[in-house]
Amino acid sequence: LYADGSETVCVYEMPDHPAFLKGISWNLVQGYEQLKHTDDVDWTFVCPSKLLDPDGPRTGDYLTRTDRHIPINEDGNSYVSYDDLAIAMVDFGQNGSFKRQLVAVASRRGGPQA
């Protein structure tokens, strides 16, 4: 995902991105770039918000973005609970939405300031 509106810097390239995740994030970007040129499989590339909360509530209420920008929820946070991300992924698989697309997911509400 892009770090800002310039669409030139990715989140993993920012100084505050955890060092132990930079290599993983770079590899994920490379995988996405390869998928974009694959015609023989259906795929959906799901990106969580900046804060992925393992203990967050299961609301089933989430929002999505497909423009490679960080999703910001109604509380002004880039936040998604594990449960809401899992629900979104199952929904995408069951209803066939976002085929051959990157989609970023955020819980509609919640996060550190909520």
Model-predicted segments: where are they?
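Oxidoreductase cofactor-interface core, primarily capturing Rossmann-like NAD(P)-dependent enzymes
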Residues: L1-A114
